[in-house]
Amino acid sequence: MLQERLNMLMDDITLQGKKLAKHMDVRDMKRYRELIKQFMNEIVSRSHKFSRENFLDRRGRHRVYGMIKLVDATLDELATELLKDEKDHLIILGKIDEIRGLLLDIFT
């Protein structure tokens, strides 16, 4: 059940990321951020269902929280780029890909 929910959210995030890359609209960014927040909330609230080694770094700390901070920081960078008058499409695409990669890293 959790796996299905995460797969659905990941698909929605991917589609919304494509929409955001195409239109570069603040409303699309807001929806994108909401979907990512839902995904991360599912991961954090139900992380006990995953094996513990998926969430521990080399020092035994929970890796997922560091990854979430990184996703948040990258989302902020993406939002900043979207709000610029001179939007750099390549930077926006790169940030969307980076976020997707981080989410997949958390997910797998």
What are these regions (language model features)?
Residues 39-46, 62, 66, 97, ...:
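Alpha-helix boundary/capping detector
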Residues 74-108:
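C-terminal or internal capping secondary-structure element at the end of a domain, subdomain, or sheet
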Residues 1-40, 47-62, 74, 90:
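N-terminal intrinsically disordered, cationic/polar leader segments
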Residues 67-75:
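Short, well-ordered alpha-helical segments
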